[in-house]
Amino acid sequence: MFRERIIVQDSLVADESGSAFRIRLPWYRALPLSTIEELSVTVDGTAFDPARLRIAVNDGEWALAEAQLRTDDVWFVLDDATVRLPGLVLDAGAHEVQATLSMRIPYLPVAGKPLSMAETDQKRMDVKELTA
């Protein structure tokens, strides 16, 4: 729905432990984290293992599989989530980041099942050093 808004422009940060960037919910209403079906990330043409990425929303941070079990943690429309890529050390300069986010919309049934939507966004961003 709002695919061009998924990746927050100029949010790519990195240090010796890995990289991170922020994403936004591509829907017009808040959704529980358990509605995330897929989150895949590619940096400079190389896919990052989804089992290793972490997502931080509100005051919590989880592996993707853990986040998909969080029925009481809600991702609000105006709040960015941080996608952490542990071990992905990036050099200074510009990098091509692509994210595909697939969400299940539980209150919109289609053919007896919840609506499923997948959106992909790609941005070229300069990496910034992660500060404490």
Curated annotation (Swiss-Prot):
Could you name the domain of life of the organism this protein comes from?
A: Bacteria
Name the needed cofactors.
Mg(2+)
Does Membrane show up as a keyword for this record? no
In terms of temperature dependence, the annotation states:
Optimum temperature is around 40 degrees Celsius.
Keywords for this protein: Carbohydrate metabolism, Lyase, Magnesium
Q: Does the keyword Magnesium apply?
A: yes
Q: What is its EC number?
A: 4.1.99.28
User: Per its Swiss-Prot or TrEMBL record, what regulates the activity?
Assistant: Activity is strongly reduced in the presence of chelating agents.
Q: What does it catalyze?
A: 3'-dehydrocarminate + H(+) = kermesate + 1,5-anhydro-D-erythro-hex-1-en-3-ulose
| Pfam families per record | CGDB
Among InterPro entries, the record links this protein to: CGDB
**How does acidity or alkalinity (pH) affect activity?**
Optimum pH is 7.5.
Q: List the Gene Ontology MF annotations in alphabetical order.
A: lyase activity
| Protein family according to the UniProt entry | Belongs to the C-glycoside deglycosidase beta subunit family.
The free-text function statement in the UniProt record for this protein reads: Carbon-carbon bond-cleaving enzyme which participates in a carminate degradation pathway. Cleaves the C-C bond in 3'-dehydrocarminate to form kermesate. Also shows weak activity with other C-glycosides, such as 3''-dehydropuerarin (3''-oxo-puerarin), 3''-dehydroisoorientin (3''-oxo-homoorientin) and 3'-dehydromangiferin (3'-oxo-mangiferin).
Quote the subunit structure annotation.
Heterodimer composed of an alpha subunit (CarB) and a beta subunit (CarC).
Q: Tell me what this protein is called.
A: 3'-dehydrocarminate deglycosidase beta subunit
